[in-house]
Amino acid sequence: DLVRYQPAFRFKSYICVCNQIGSMNENVLTKLKILAESAKYDVSCASSGTVRSNKPGMLGNTVGGWGICHSFAEDGRCISLLKVMLTNYCIYDCAYCINRRSNDLPRATLSVSELVELTIEFYRRNYIEGLFLSSGVVRSPDYTMERLVRVAKDLRQVHRFNGYIHLKSIPGASRELVNEAGLYADRLSVNVEIPKEENLKLLAPEKD
């Protein structure tokens, strides 16, 4: 089993971490850089609204490396998570989203096996204690949600991963898939950016 313990994290930049993972090919690391960048706009797993660097005579800072976010475990500990998207492609064109279909930005997709391997490699090297995973919607909400569930399921059942997992529920996914995700994730969250129907029609006309 991958047994969790409490390492003294050295918050290195994403590139420094990746340079030390020799088993990963360059293509996977390029995709990871793109998808970690896209994931940073999801504020549900942000350290705080404050950017505060280390100062002489003071301990700590609020700035982690690329692809790393801070969250709080059930026991109150602040833990470091690999924060990444499965893909930043999306069938929707929501005006509020950086990853909307019409936006001109680098796109990438990690396979389930690639993301599982990345998580395990980072975890074994004590750079993270868990995973925060979200995704753009590809093909359909259920197709996308099923892939998120497969990542969590493979981590738990195949690799005996005992770290923290936070999954973002895909809007429109079936209740069955969301329930299955809850079997493997420590935390599930959903986006509620637009509480009124008229605002939804204005900003995301393809959703209902």
Where are these regions (language model features)?
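Residues in and immediately flanking transmembrane alpha helices
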Residues: 44-50, 96, 181, 199
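Core AdoMet radical
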Residues: 100-115, 122-148, 154-175, 182-208
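Flexible, acidic/Gly-rich N-terminal and inter-domain linker regions that tether
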Residues: 1-89
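N-terminal, well-ordered alpha-helical segments
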Residues: 79-83, 92-95, 113, 117-120, ...
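Local cysteine-cluster metal-coordination motifs and their immediate loop/turn environment
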Residues: 88-100
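Short, flexible, glycine/charge-rich loop motifs used to bind or transfer phosphoryl groups or to couple energy/partner
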Residues: 69-72, 121, 178
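Short, glycine/polar-rich helix-capping loops at beta-to-alpha or helix-loop-helix junctions
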Residues: 90, 175-178
